Amino acid sequence: MIISATSDYRAAAQRTLPPFLFHYIDGGAYAEYTLRRNVEDLSQVALRQRVLKNMSDLSLETTLFNETLSMPVALAPVGLCGMYARRGEVQAAAAADAKGIPFTLSTVSVCPIEEVAPTLKRPMWFQLYVLRDRGFMRNALERAKAAGCSTLVFTVDMPTPGARYRDAHSGMSGPNAAMRRYWQAVMHPKWAWDVGLNGRPHDLGNISAYLGKPTGLEDYIGWLANNFDPSISWKDLEWIREFWDGPMVIKGILDPEDARDAVRFGADGIVVSNHGGRQLDGVLSSARALPAIADAVKGDIAILADSGIRNGLDVVRMIALGADTVLLGRAYLYALATAGKTGVANLLDLIEKEMKVAMTLTGAKSISEISGDSLVQELGKSLPAALAPMSKGDAA
């Protein structure tokens, strides 16, 4: 199979993975309007072509939280990554490390902090939720710090899980889910051998280190579902500051006032994100939310963005709309499921090449030169959010 784009990896992942796993990462909340809009809105951002600019000394390098990145991209925290390839977090982290960009380990990763961190040359980032069990949160923060994690990504848009209808149809949840997953695995022997049999243990490593070994993955998921905390407030973040003195990034910001609150709190960064369309369907795409947030806090706090990014052009678009760096989620999961570390490394190479083409043809020699001037019109001005059509497309 010829791989030339994220869409090729998506198609390959759909063939490789049991449906319950493919649709878990590919799907979103409710009717998936926001999921689709994440991609569609970003694709409508028109780049401004410039010529005869002598682009021979182009550079993608940037700095974030005193770390040098080879390009303004980091791998986002993705739960159950180790179910998409054997010890998937280790493989994805290795690809990011070799590329010179950060890898973010999810709270609900299969591989624990202690398995992933020692394999890397650069410090990884760690993502954490606010949970009712504050003992677990403190334990996770202490372990992340001991392992040398440099940056905490604090996810705040999940006080309760979103309703993901596709999961009930795919076998991730719903009636007879365990039996359906079993037969799906039987019908996908490559995955069953590589991950199902040889990728064990199939637990949530960061949680099992705290709770001990449960009887099955469902036990972890049940514990986690009962621990999401709808009472979350800025006071919880103040408590976390007692145990974490490194850079803290607040993930899940879609409103300028929340961004201002993050600045007032003293956060080091925010992620403009709708959780990849997996939480509240019908909210703004990240591309639509980003310009107003950048207008409110640009220069006061580092701005990261995710949701809908599929290629290097999308990275340039997000930066032109106001982001300093972007996070890749689904795109790298598709590549990981297809070809492990090699797939993720190849995807990152593709994104780098696409960024270089986009920057060369828009006249931006460095990341700092990508701005609103790189666009024909900003998305919010060229297509008002209230008038944007709802149309079908690939999952975001």
UniProtKB/Swiss-Prot annotation:
GO cellular component, one term: plasma membrane
Chief location bin: membrane
Key words of the record: Cell inner membrane, Cell membrane, Flavoprotein, FMN, Membrane, Oxidoreductase
Domain of life the protein comes from: Bacteria
Compartmental location: Cell inner membrane
GO molecular function: FMN binding; L-lactate dehydrogenase activity
Active site: H275 (proton acceptor)
Pfam families, A to Z: FMN_dh
UniProt topology in membrane: Peripheral membrane protein
Domain called FMN hydroxy acid dehydrogenase: residue spans: 1-380
Entry cofactors: FMN
Gene3D superfamilies, sorted: Aldolase class I
Sites where the protein binds FMN: 106, 127, 155, 251, 306-330
This enzyme's EC code(s): 1.1.-.-
UniProt: substrate binding residues: Y24, Y129, R164, R278
BP GO annotations: aerobic respiration; lactate metabolic process
Family label: Belongs to the FMN-dependent alpha-hydroxy acid dehydrogenase family.
NCBIfam families the UniProt entry points to: L_lactate_LldD (NF033901), PRK11197.1 (NF008398)
Protein purpose: Catalyzes the conversion of L-lactate to pyruvate. Is coupled to the respiratory chain.
PANTHER family listed in its UniProt record: L-LACTATE DEHYDROGENASE (PTHR10578:SF85), S -2-HYDROXY-ACID OXIDASE-RELATED (PTHR10578)
Protein name as annotated: L-lactate dehydrogenase
